[in-house]
């Protein structure tokens, strides 16, 4: 699994007091969101199109890489996208359950 249980939040920001020369401030943002899967899908589609044509493959195999390494990398990328999709689907289901609970709670009368 590519996801770890010990990360409680999905966003981290930091501001550096010592900025690069010529700038007043430096900041870093790291976000772990299922939205990244769209980028992975696009890269995977581009890779697959080039790999099917064996574009540039000779440069890598000539240096000792095996074609199977590319197939394995493609499979790993597809697995990663699938896992992000599962987390996205699970989150959407959880939100749906929360909305249902909220709607049920609104129908109750309190004395």
From Swiss-Prot:
Localisation: Cytoplasm, Cytoskeleton
The keyword GTP-binding belongs to this UniProt entry's keyword annotation: yes
GO biological process, one term: microtubule-based process
Keyword list, A-Z: Cytoplasm, Cytoskeleton, GTP-binding, Microtubule, Nucleotide-binding
Chief place where the protein resides: cytoplasm
Cofactor: Mg(2+)
Database matches in Pfam families: Tubulin_C
Chain intervals for the UniProt region annotation (Disordered): 82-111
SUPFAM superfamilies on file: Tubulin C-terminal domain-like
GO cellular component: a single term: cytoplasm
Bias kind Acidic residues: ranges: 91-111
A GO term for molecular function: structural constituent of cytoskeleton
Subunit relationships: Dimer of alpha and beta chains. A typical microtubule is a hollow water-filled tube with an outer diameter of 25 nm and an inner diameter of 15 nM. Alpha-beta heterodimers associate head-to-tail to form protofilaments running lengthwise along the microtubule wall with the beta-tubulin subunit facing the microtubule plus end conferring a structural polarity. Microtubules usually have 13 protofilaments but different protofilament numbers can be found in some organisms and specialized cells.
Family statement drawn from the similarity comment of this UniProt entry: Belongs to the tubulin family.
Function (record text): Tubulin is the major constituent of microtubules, a cylinder consisting of laterally associated linear protofilaments composed of alpha- and beta-tubulin heterodimers. Microtubules grow by the addition of GTP-tubulin dimers to the microtubule end, where a stabilizing cap forms. Below the cap, tubulin dimers are in GDP-bound state, owing to GTPase activity of alpha-tubulin.
Protein name: Tubulin beta chain
Natural source organism: Lymnaea stagnalis (Great pond snail)
Taxonomic path: Eukaryota, Metazoa, Spiralia, Lophotrochozoa, Mollusca
